Amino acid sequence: MENLMVIDSVCTYCGVGCDIAANVNVAENKIVNIFAHPDGVVSQGKLCIKGKYGFDFVTSPNRLRIPRIKKTFLEKNPSIKDTIAHSLKEYDAIWFETDLDCATTAAAMKLKEVQEKYGRKSVCSIGGARTSCESSYLFQKFTRHTLNSPHVDNCARVCHSPSLKGMRTTIGEGAATNPYNDIYNCEFMIVIGSNTTEAHPIIANRILDVAREHDNLAVFDVREIKLHRFAKYKAIMPHEANLLVLNMLAYVIIDEELYHENFLHERTKGFDEFKEKILNDPFANPKYFEQIEGYQNLSKMIPKIAREYALKKSMIFWGLGITEHLDGSYAVMAITHLALMTGNIGKSGAGLMPLRGQNNVQGTCDMGMLPYYAPDYQEPKEIGLMTPQLVEEMLEGRVKALLNIGEDIMHIHPNLNKIERAIENLELIFVQELFMTEVAQKADIVVGVKSAYEKTGVYINAMRRLHLSQPLVQSDLPDDWEVLQMLDNKMGGSAEYKNSNEIWDEVREVAYRRFSGASYIRLERHRVRGLQWPVHTEDTPILHQLDFRTEDGLGEFHYHQYKLRGMVEEISSKTLTGYHLTTGRTLAHYNNAAQTKESEKLNSRYDEDILLVHEGDAADFTGEKVILKTEFGQTNPLTLKFTDKVQPKTLFVTFHHAQSKINNLFGDKCDELILTAAFKSIKVEVINT
């Protein structure tokens, strides 16, 4: 077609960060179709269905185009209403429409009032992992410097913060050690707590290619997933047994002296103490599983996996099935221990790969959108509170204003009933979004912004690869950073960036240890290959080749014993009753489905959350639908599907659709160190309807 132009960019969905190209009708300013970039280093000519078909949201009639202010907010704040009255237009019974200048003026007036009344720390900022690095950087800078509040956080809190904590504790860097294509140089692979084919399918393609050719894959999960079909070792675990299994792998490596003595001597510390503790840990011997009915086969399978891992060039992949537990950070440390013991790190075909969830959650953490890290993981001048702590502060009346960018805390966070009570105490909720998500509906002021397919910016994927995106279509909506700059100026700040490039140049100066050599010009020149941080004269595809990024350059062992609890404790004491639930994604949707549900091709595949139940448990499920209930709340009625892919007395459900209210079930149980919610296991009551 005459008006078609092919434009390259990066996929807006998961942390894999696939290279995409789009046929764009320039005359109509419309994406015709999206396909894998033919030379894409990440996508390698393939995209998942979200990448291919999940672009209808860009032109959806449901997009937020004009800023809105809630009428009840203006009734409570008459001086603000008087100031912006000239711009207000009736939208519906709940909202006025206004312009961006007045929306940010109203927000700034209220922010000043809140801080004058309750103090500088009464304001918090949450979000950023769905937007560009430039916007994330400015979000934390505006909050910390202009508002002088230390309270910044992002959705890594509910996903991979334990990976960051665990890896930085042991090897000094909380990111993937290798590029994806190193999978092809790998001799053995362990996947644990990751439904990779559904959540990260383009990485799964590589894993499956190698597994089919070499029969060298071990898969650990609490239910049977697609990867198990291609695995040499098909390990089904009881719920909450990650740390138990990982310590057992380490036990076998130590007991059979399969560790790499030279590597341990030259590049690590603390191994002798670690060795003594693990050999004396009653839970570390794989024979423990001989007494766990239904899982006895693990007692023989775990030693076989440990031997192959130790004696071959090996990689470990993990997802939220590891991190969203009480001991998520400790389990990540246990994963790194395996690599340190065997020297399976710092070289091609051997390493560690946390499979990040959001398209820019790696970049947002790199930008310092965390309460305990400034940009480049430097120590901030003041440590703020993590999101669960901020919710408590809201309930106590000490935090009174929330700034939110693209993080639906009313859908993806735990204990939604508690969060709803907390935000009712706020005097200002200011949200930047694409759609009227659950949190946007609760907002006092909501501003529509550009999507990733409408702007220029840097995104960093799960393998530390920087991709300079470019807009596929043009939009007159503001970028997130432009809204923040307006707020900053009205709050007395001095931000005067002309474009995202100027912000990125500042990032390169502030976070020079990672990005000094990653100019826009260079990123544009290497758009197809991408550059992996740290980027100086050259980039760094493989981390830790000579030293770990700890203070002394040595990897460190930090042993943590498994704590008997949950399903394992119930089975061992023969008191197993009721049902244990775990949650996860499906291929057709992405997290809260705000974008994917706008695509009929995607939503028609999975238009409701479905509860998977073992066939043998059918007698307990007599209704057409069931409600799940815990002490914290209950779901709405859920459709059932009986299958042999989940274990007896275990259930699985996705959480994509807000109307399901899945996260009502979860309370405050969380990772001990980093407060990531324990989404992956909870005991539920079944109510037939």
Descriptions of predicted regions:
Residues 249, 267-386, 533-536:
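Active-site phosphate/pyrophosphate-binding segments
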Residues 476-526, 598-611, 617-689:
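Long, contiguous, secondary-structure-rich segments that constitute the structural scaffold
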Residues 32, 259-262, 315-316, 344-354, ...:
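Acidic/polar loop patches that form or flank catalytic/metal-binding clefts of enzymes
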Residues 230-231, 282-286, 318-322, 465-473:
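Flexible glycine/proline-enriched surface loops and loop-helix/loop-strand junctions
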Residues 137-208, 213-220, 244-247, 336-445, ...:
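Extended redox/cofactor-interaction regions of prokaryotic respiratory oxidoreductases
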Residues 1-258, 267-270, 274-280, 298, ...:
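N-terminal export/assembly segments and adjacent metallocofactor-ligating motifs
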Residues 80-96, 258-297, 472-541, 604-605, ...:
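N-terminal leader/propeptide and maturation segments of large enzyme subunits in energy/redox metabolism
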Residues 9, 16-19, 418, 425-437, ...:
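Phosphate/diphosphate-binding loops
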